[in-house]
Amino acid sequence: MKLKILHFTSGNKLHIDNILKKLKSKLSEFEYQFYISLMEYDENASRTDMKVFYVPNIFVANWIKSNHLESIIDAFEEESNNGVRPEIHIKVKEKKENVKSLKNNKSMLYFNTNGLSLNPFYTFENFVVGKSNEYAYTIAKLVLQQQASAYNPVLLYGKSGLGKTHLLNAIGNDVKEKNKNVLYVTSEDFLNDYMDKIKRKTMDSFRDKYRKCDYLLIDDVQFFGGKEGIQEELLHTFNTLHNSQKQIVMTSDKPPKEIKGLEERLRTRFEWGAMAEITNPELETKIAIIKSKCEVNRIVLENEVIDYIASNIYGNIRQIEGILSTINAHINLSPESSSLKIAKNVLKNYQIEKLEGITLDNIIKVVSKELNIKPSEIVSKERNRKVTFARRAVIYLAHSLMINSMNIIAKELGMKDHSSVSKALKAIKKEIAENSTTRNIIEDMKSKIQQSLDSV
């Protein structure tokens, strides 16, 4: 892929190509293909000390700003010996064109009258990529390039609300433009359709529908567990499509081996191709998601508020839109109030779900594993730097994630009283505020604690 250049001369093109080669040599294939190659350089808007780039959406912009800005600066300086300041802007499409395309292209809204309607807003362009979903995103993109290759079937799995359905729709949105016959259904719809055709004695039409498509996209296949009759029909459908070199993509809230009541023959077929897990998003990804939701919904929040929200939501990212809408409503009703204070009050309503099931033992196990120390050291009287940091991390996480009072935390950790816990909490909060490395370590442990509960 080439870095696109707007308004270039032959000399400038060579200059940009050299910079592109430098970037490609320093970055992974994934980073280059899905981020750097999407940049468009605008020569007319650029100056010697400032270079203007356009990218297709806010997600790419945020990712490049967070991860690759220094690499771009270094590449320009190596090429021209001049200091530069890159400006990353989002390329805006004409609204009339968007409206026209929706009116004139019914497949934008419906890609198969025999299946579910495709959500036109679930695309690869507005899917926020992070460490938690990078592999799943890559596999989904590769399906478009190498249909019926090693990536068949594809199974995307992870708990609800993390983006599996978004990726499934993104695949459908993409391939529908290539005049492929795409069928997207939930497993429950597949079952209901099966039962209806049996009742009507029209199973031939059922088989024609599901076995003659180019892409079969099935959401929530864990629903098939324990349903023997439909599993037999799905097995034959699977075999027919696979033998015909047709692509199958599925989602599940768990890997095949954990789906109770799933026949062994079907389980092995689910595992034939590529399986990709989507886990809870890390802090940077949550921040990018919140910023994108704010932009789409025209919600203006300070970075301090966005950071607070990202640091205090766990698991299901589907909550984010509801949280942002509630915060925005409160801000509009009380414009004189602090946005951060409003955000804190709103998030209290989401704490019950977050707190359920978390124990101090969960937290100590995760912290001790991540920091490579023994759990017994955390509850001991030792005061060396490593143990002190681990103990403070446990206190901070317990205070953030649990209902327990300071006195209970002090007792469990063998500390004198709540004042000792308060002092340790104040110290770790200060370190988190001043040290981004500490903050990232703590946030990573928060995610691991949530994941440890999800796996139970």
Curated annotation (Swiss-Prot):
A Pfam family: Bac_DnaA_C
Disulfide bonding pattern of the chain: none
Domain II as annotated region, ranges: 83-116
Residues that bind ATP: G161, G163, K164, T165
UniProt feature coiled coil, ranges: none
Function: Plays an essential role in the initiation and regulation of chromosomal replication. ATP-DnaA binds to the origin of replication (oriC) to initiate formation of the DNA replication initiation complex once per cell cycle. Binds the DnaA box (a 9 base pair repeat at the origin) and separates the double-stranded (ds)DNA. Forms a right-handed helical filament on oriC DNA; dsDNA binds to the exterior of the filament while single-stranded (ss)DNA is stabiized in the filament's interior.
Name of the protein in question: Chromosomal replication initiator protein DnaA
